[in-house]
Structures are given as C-alpha cells and as structure tokens.
Amino acid sequence: VAAVGTGVIVVLGEKLNFKGRSLIKNSFNLNSLGGMIRFLRSLFVATFIIESIGAALSFPVFIQQYTWWDALGISCFHSIAAFNNSGFDILGTGESLAAYTHHIWLNVVTISLIFLGGIGFLVIYEVWNEKWFWRTWSLNTCTSIFMGTTILIIGAILLKFTESFSWLNAFFYSMSARTAGFATIPLSSFAPVTMMTMLILMFIGAAPGSTGGGIKTTTLFVLLMRIRKAVTNKPEEMFHYSIPNSAFRKASIVFFMGLFVVYVSTYLVLMTNPHIPFL
C-alpha cells in the first residue's frame, strides 16, 4: 500500500517528501533514504515481470479446463494472489487448488511465486542489482534467503512425517502455510500434530518488507543466534556480519508481542465460541 501510494505521487509529478521517504524506508526495511525513486521503480518493474512470468507459466494448466479468456484471467489472478501471499480462490469451487493436488507444474509455480513474494522486495532489489554476487548482499538479504529456504525444507520434512503427504504436498504446505493460505488438501483431514506444525510456520511467517506476515524469519534468525551464543559462547556472526544487541532487543519484543497477541486472540475466540475445537 505504501509503495503504490508513493508511486502514484511520483507519477503525478509530485516530490517525495521526508515523511513519504521515511514511510517507504520503514515499510521495506531500507538502510537509508537515498535512492528511493530508483528502488520504487525497480520494485514495480520486478513485480510486473515476476507476476507476468507466473501467469504465463500457469496459463497452460488452466487452458485445459477453461476458455482462452477465462484461463488468461485465472492465470493472472492466481499469479498475483500467489506472489502477494493472499491465497484468494478465484476458481469458484470453495476448495482452493484441491483439483490440482498432484499437478507438479502448477504446484511448483505457486511455491516459487509465494517464495519470491515472501523473501521481501529489498531482497529482490539487491539480488537484481548485485547480479547474484552474494558477498555484496546485506545481512537482511542473506538472512531472508537462508531462513526462507531452511524453513521451507524443515517444514516440508516435518509435514511429510506427520501426515501421509507426498513430497510435493509437503513442500506446498510448508510454503503456503507460512503466509499464503492456498490449499490443495482439505485442512479438516489433517492430524493435530500437522496443524500444530502449520501453526508454528504461520507464526514465523515471511521476511521483512515482503507481502507476508508473521513475526518475520529474520526475527527468528536473530533469536537463534543469541541462543547459539548462550550455548557455545561463539560470537553472533553470520554471513561475515555481526549482529548488534539492538537487533536482539527488537527481535525479543516482536517475538513476545506476537505470542501475546496470538494467545489473547485465541483465548477470546475460544471463550466466545466454545463449540469451536482448539485445533
């Protein structure tokens, strides 16, 4: 929302004031106020390219069941929904992507779009400009990619061994559960341990400055680094960067505030709706 609003201001020829620059800086976890217009331009271009590619890759799947125009519209909508981690169902069946549970191509495309939307625009911007030379990336970019990939793999392994999933479904739900909300299998059929695993994934969420929610993968990373230091007495360093104490304080606040909000919300829902099961 901040990016679109600021983009409209720029298109109309208005200057981006300090307040607007600060809003963009905080929204996308930028390091400085410089190069804001270039960042926004790259953001819109990268988003358009990624969503267009996603729609083009999804089109051959939907054209098999829908007319040309319907397939085009569904492909575009699905690509945008996946990249923005919204999980909207446009198929009209009320079952999300259940009809494509075993469709490898569409599942992989959807996972890829969710992943790209969930690692954050700043990450995409840095990778786009640094030409994949990871040693020049910021700590945020390195951490977002590392944690996003690690959580995806660990989540898939846990889901695979707690439910009778195929590896395709395990990776799909490990990715979708964190922020997107797409479903290829009815959630009502899941075991309690599977639901608990998905709750943890949802609580973690995506990277800062992304289209996803949660406490953020970087928050979890900072807390894990502090735990490692307490156990091994090794310095809090990763990817040739050291982690300042201020980052740990912020991560702790976000983590415990997240737990508090989830607990209070769950308590109120269970209290006002006693007929709803806990899991």
Predicted regions and their residues:
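Membrane-proximal intracellular helices of multi-pass ion channels
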Residues: V1-L279
